[in-house]
């Protein structure tokens, strides 16, 4: 009986791993990897939940930004949907006022619409972004001064 128990203890983890290898399963509970500061200031983590391919042409990525982080102006060749999972952030489209986004909000951004989204000055934010397979088109840096002016206008909202 002890030998059987030992065999089960040894084999069960490998069987479980083999079962997991049969499926494409990811978790939005994972923080992901820290993103290099290429198009943002501050700390950001990206978790590629599903990467677009020939059969499914949408990327689904979880992004988490620490408080007081920026993300540059950008656009996508397809619509983008943001589902805010936790925290408080900002969202703005070009030539429109910035707004506060928070846990539970779902934002739809039309294709080719220049916009940015990130954490608020005092809170981190985590969201799932759903967008097409074409690469993000980065258009303009967000300066610390611009971000701070938006944060000042939205403070307390």
Label each PLM-derived region with a short phrase:
Residues 73, 91-92, 114-120:
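Short beta-strand His + acidic residue motifs that chelate non-heme Fe in jelly-roll/DSBH
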Residues 108, 122-140:
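A short hydrophobic beta-strand segment most commonly corresponding to one strand
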Residues 4-13:
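Sec-dependent N-terminal signal peptides
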Residues 59-76:
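Conserved short histidine dyad/triad with adjacent acidic residue
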Residues 95-112:
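Short acidic-glycine-tyrosine-enriched beta hairpin
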Residues 17-57, 137-140, 144-157:
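A short, N-terminal "cap"/entry segment at the start of jelly-roll beta-barrel domains
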Residues 76-90, 94-95:
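Glycine- and acidic-residue-biased ligand/ion/polar-headgroup-sensing regions
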